[in-house]
Amino acid sequence: MVSSSTIKSLIEKKGKDLPESVKQELYEKLIKYNEKYKLTKAEVETIIDEVVKEYERALVEPGEAVGTVAAQSIGEPSTQMTLNTFHYAGVAEINVTLGLPRIIEIVDARKNPSTPMMTVYLDEEHRYDREKAEEVARRIEGTTLENLARTTTLDLINMEFIVEIDPERLEKSGLTMEKVLKKLQSSFKSAEFEMEGYTLIVRPKKFEKISDLRRLAEKVKKHRLKGLSGVGKTIVRKEGDEYVIYTEGSNFKQVLKVPGVDPTRTKTNNIHEIAEVLGIEAARNAIIEEIMNTMREQGLEVDIRHIMLVADIMTLDGVVRPIGRHGVVGEKASVLARAAFEITVQHLFEAAERGEVDNLSGVIENVLIGQPVPVGTGMVKLTMKLPLRPQKEKEEV
């Protein structure tokens, strides 16, 4: 049986080119299997050699057109993806965009996803008790007067807006009629409010035409009484031992401040919110995770390195940029590449005005002028030095 210090020294000696994370993982696994199978030094060396060989085989060849390979590897499975919006797996009440529309949404770096949602994990105190989890959900869930109303009526004769509140919904939201009235009175100074049991009557203080009443009624209905802005309904689900809250809508910055929420695990599917709150590295990881999860939902397997390349390019400048005419492609350093993409004359005029120089370092610009592209064997520049003829031969000539 080999000692742990010998294993460590063999890894350092034979696997010097391996990344630290791979070395550490290899060391831990060798220690584990050494205890189980009593490995010899020769066996340990063979295992390390195999790992090094596999690692080198996994590396990208110099000059490989990684962008083209990534585009093909993501594009081909995407043709088999569905074009529909599905219910989120396991949460039938919440609609979430999946499939190809979600992939397009991510790579286009849309500011607002079509179906934003958050997965809110809870802290030690709240995660094992359903009542406590629902209490946190009530703090998060955005509640408007419309959510609490059983019926709403516009009385044009008396110029009143009448709202019948549902007592069950009111109790579930954790509000009371007094609280509702107080919140509305503080927000709408131009209206009078009257309460009769579970009925709320709203009258404008001044009005000139019926449209004023309609406008006031719409504003009162949509007024948020509690919860986070941008968040609609919440659903509490049990996953394993703990309760998790799913939300329709997203307000990542505010949800992390809610008492009872675990800020280290809570997630949103809005990439821009993640970049704003947690930084660009977190946004990069979110892009990778979202695309990989969307692919897996459809039963498609794509090598994560292709997705990582896309995420790297999108977040290269410290902001999340789309892949397209308004982002990565439209901002290429090469004038000819930009001109070849679209709006040719405008790009050429602007570049001439600025005095730009094209170093012909990319593929498109070299294809345009008929040069070998700097990919694969085209990256290598050979110069051949011919042997000099001896002095005697020169004299004979």
From Swiss-Prot:
The keyword Cell cycle does not apply. The keyword Ribonucleoprotein does not apply. One of its GO terms (biological process) is DNA-templated transcription. Keywords: Cytoplasm, DNA-binding, DNA-directed RNA polymerase, Nucleotidyltransferase, Transcription, Transferase. It catalyses: RNA(n) + a ribonucleoside 5'-triphosphate = RNA(n+1) + diphosphate. Its EC number is 2.7.7.6. GO terms for cellular component: cytoplasm; DNA-directed RNA polymerase complex. It is an enzyme of class 2 (transferase). GO terms for molecular function: DNA binding; DNA-directed RNA polymerase activity. Its main location: cytoplasm. It is found in: Cytoplasm. Part of the RNA polymerase complex. Belongs to the RNA polymerase beta' chain family. DNA-dependent RNA polymerase (RNAP) catalyzes the transcription of DNA into RNA using the four ribonucleoside triphosphates as substrates. Forms part of the jaw domain. This is DNA-directed RNA polymerase subunit Rpo1C. The gene is rpo1C.
